[in-house]
Each structure stands twice: as C-alpha cells, then as structure tokens.
C-alpha cells in the first residue's frame, strides 16, 4: 500500500478544536486528510464519517448535492460527542475528478441523472477506491466504528478491511429542491439507504 502518514496539526473550527492528519498516496499522487477529536485510539467504538472531496458542495455551497451539509453535520455530531474522526478523501466527483464532474453536471442539465452522466462519459457510477482507508485506520489505531453513512459500499469496504462496524448511523441532511432527484437516483441506482430514522 502506498498511503503514508505525513504530519498532524491542530485545526480550530467553529465546531471546536480538531486535529488534522495528513496522508500521501504515491500511487495516485493525491493527498488525504483525517480530522479527529478526542482519543480515537482507545478500544471504544469511534464515531466516523468517510467523506469524499466535493469542492462544489463543501466550499462553494452548491445545492446540487448534499455533500457540504453532510460534512458540517458530521463535524457537529463529533463535536457534541467529543470524540470521532472524519476521513476526507480526495476523490472528487465519486472518483472522476473535478473537470469530469463539471462535464457530468452539463449532461445532468440536459436531463441525464447522476449515474447516466458518469456512464455517458465512460466512467462507472462510482469510481472511488476505499482501499486507501486501511493504512489510515491502522495509523490512527481505530478498529471499531459507529459509521455515519447511507452508502452500503462504505459499509462493505470497511468490513472488507477488517474494521468492525458496531453501528450504522443514518446521515441524512441537506435535501432541497435542487438535489431531490439526485438523492432519489442515489437511492434507486446506488442503493443508498434514505428515509430511515436517525439512530444516534
């Protein structure tokens, strides 16, 4: 595995003080970060969010997706609990990259859904690689998690790499008129689990 730990620093945020841990992936030349709060290396299950980079949603406040709202909600939940980790993976556009994501958005403007747009560009519906998580979890000493997710692929990936998911916490937030069809496509074509009671 080519993912290596680089360095850590403090990261003050409106939700509280996090630690930011940097990792490099030589195989893709990408840099990933993990935000942690509290001691995540103890044996108690850790509240965890696996979040893929979304420039448009996280930084530009786009309403086409629910990514920005999900990131902020995850940070808020961890701050309330006082302990947790957010794995921020640099896999923009479900792994197709920012410029291809813009191309996919153009196709969606013309009527394609999010899966059809990826496929018309020659990509799979979800190109993300979750194998990069294993060395990050190992470095941080996290073995058991309470996973904030609606995505069954993330559950399968963590289980495959030996992470014990003791609880799945539904993570639904950010629905609006601009992303309602997008979320329904994620549910219908990608198997995302929406419409459940929040289990925290």
Curated annotation (Swiss-Prot):
Catalytic residues of the enzyme: 126, 128
Keywords: GTP-binding, Hydrolase, Metal-binding, Nucleotide-binding, Riboflavin biosynthesis, Zinc
GO cellular component: cytosol
Note accompanying the cofactor annotation: Binds 1 zinc ion per subunit.
This protein's record includes keyword Protein transport: no
BP terms from Gene Ontology: riboflavin biosynthetic process
UniProt-recorded Gene Ontology molecular function terms: GTP binding; GTP cyclohydrolase II activity; zinc ion binding
Protein's pathway: Cofactor biosynthesis; riboflavin biosynthesis; 5-amino-6-(D-ribitylamino)uracil from GTP: step 1/4
Residue positions binding Zn(2+): 54, 65, 67
EC number of the protein: 3.5.4.25
Pfam family, one: GTP_cyclohydro2
Gene3D superfamilies, alphabetized: GTP cyclohydrolase II
Catalyses which reaction(s): GTP + 4 H2O = 2,5-diamino-6-hydroxy-4-(5-phosphoribosylamino)-pyrimidine + formate + 2 phosphate + 3 H(+)
Cofactor: Zn(2+)
Residues engaged in binding GTP: 49-53, 70, 92-94, 114, 149, 154
Described function: Catalyzes the conversion of GTP to 2,5-diamino-6-ribosylamino-4(3H)-pyrimidinone 5'-phosphate (DARP), formate and pyrophosphate.
Family, similarity comment: Belongs to the GTP cyclohydrolase II family.
Protein name from the UniProt record: GTP cyclohydrolase-2
The organism of origin for this protein: Saccharophagus degradans (strain 2-40 / ATCC 43961 / DSM 17024)
Gene name of the encoded protein: ribA
């Amino acid at each position: 595995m080519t993912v290596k730990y680089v360095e850590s620093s403090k990261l003050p945020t409106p939700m509280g003080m996090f630690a930011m841990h940097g990792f490099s992936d030589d195989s893709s030349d990408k840099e990933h970060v993990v935000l942690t709060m509290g001691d995540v290396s103890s044996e108690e299950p850790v509240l965890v969010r696996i979040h893929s980079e979304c420039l448009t949603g996280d930084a530009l406040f786009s309403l086409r997706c629910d990514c920005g709202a999900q990131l902020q909600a995850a940070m808020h939940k961890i701050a309330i609990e006082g302990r947790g980790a957010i794995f921020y993976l640099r896999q923009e556009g479900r792994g197709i990259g920012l410029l291809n994501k813009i191309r996919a958005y153009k196709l969606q403007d013309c009527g394609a859904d999010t899966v059809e747009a990826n496929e018309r560009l020659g990509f799979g519906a979800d190109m993300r690689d979750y194998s990069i998580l294993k060395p990050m979890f190992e470095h941080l000493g996290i073995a058991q998690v309470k996973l904030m997710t609606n995505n069954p692929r993330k559950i399968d990936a963590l289980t495959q790499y030996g992470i014990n998911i003791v609880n799945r916490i539904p993570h639904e937030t950010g629905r609006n008129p601009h992303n309602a069809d997008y979320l329904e496509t994620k549910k219908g074509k990608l198997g995302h689990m929406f419409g459940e009671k929040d289990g925290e």
